[in-house]
């Protein structure tokens, strides 16, 4: 079991208590589905299950052995001058499926 401690200072006079994260792997005695990891956050006396099934991104190395890594959604805190002090999800990457070429425009 891995142990992480996060403590963060947030603007707008908002304080956040330290958050303790435990990355726990499935054991034979667990009733979780196969290949399932989960993250627990402990804030004071409260324990929260943050993520039950984590998506994995598979990478193939030169020997065709698969390696897995956790895919994480990034979040950002907008500046206090913007009128919001909460977290908001990162914007999706733009899709460039439409290609504009000179001379192909219609009237």
Curated annotation (Swiss-Prot):
List the keywords (alphabetical): Mitochondrion
User: Per its UniProt entry, which superkingdom is the organism in?
Assistant: Eukaryota
Cellular compartment(s): Mitochondrion
Gene Ontology CC terms, in alphabetical order:
mitochondrion
Miscellaneous notes for this chain?
Answer: A stretch of 270 kb of the mitochondrial genome is duplicated within the centromere of chromosome 2 resulting in the duplication of the gene. The expression of the duplicated gene is not demonstrated.
Q: What is this protein called?
A: Uncharacterized mitochondrial protein AtMg01060
Q: Which organism is it from?
A: Arabidopsis thaliana (Mouse-ear cress)
């Amino acid at each position: 079991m891995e142990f992480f401690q996060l403590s963060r200072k947030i603007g707008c006079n908002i304080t956040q208590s330290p958050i303790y994260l435990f990355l726990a792997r499935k054991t034979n005695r667990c009733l979780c589905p196969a290949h399932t990891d989960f993250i627990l956050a402990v804030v004071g006396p409260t324990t929260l299950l943050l993520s039950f099934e984590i998506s994995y991104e598979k990478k193939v190395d030169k020997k065709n052995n698969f390696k897995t890594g956790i895919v994480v959604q990034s979040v950002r805190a907008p500046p206090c001058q913007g009128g919001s002090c909460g977290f908001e999800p990162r914007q999706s990457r733009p899709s460039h499926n439409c290609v504009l070429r000179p001379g192909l425009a219609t009237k």
